[in-house]
Amino acid sequence: MNLATIWNLPCIFVVENNGYAESTSSKWSVSLSGNASDRAAGFGMPGVEVDGHDFFAVYEAAGEAVERARNGGGPTLLECKLNRYYGHYEGDAQTYRPKDEVKILRETKDCLVKFRNKVTSDGKIDASELDTIDKNVLKLIEES
């Protein structure tokens, strides 16, 4: 990141922050506020924190970072705050998480559900069209 700033490179560093450093909450293992985006200032670049569950927020923030890079504004660190549903590795019992955390996250923050609700309520696409897309994707998965 240092050289990207020194050389004013047109790049975007994307951090997918799921709140855990393997099996330790990042609150216990990361200095500063726990936000990776805050670290960008030390390298002289903008750091942007965005809700990684929100497609449109990520799209907008990434678009601004791309525009900045294309216009000679140098690098950006884009931190997408989100949650993971599965463990850090195959067989991870996730004993470090509250038992109902994943269930609650799936019910309240699922990015696909949020996307579907937003585009259908805004009239951008009909729910039946999304259902058709879902069926086609599931068929492709089944066939592969």
Regions found by a protein language model. Give the residues of each.
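Glycine-rich ThDP/TPP pyrophosphate-binding loop and its adjacent helix/strand module
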Residues: 1-143
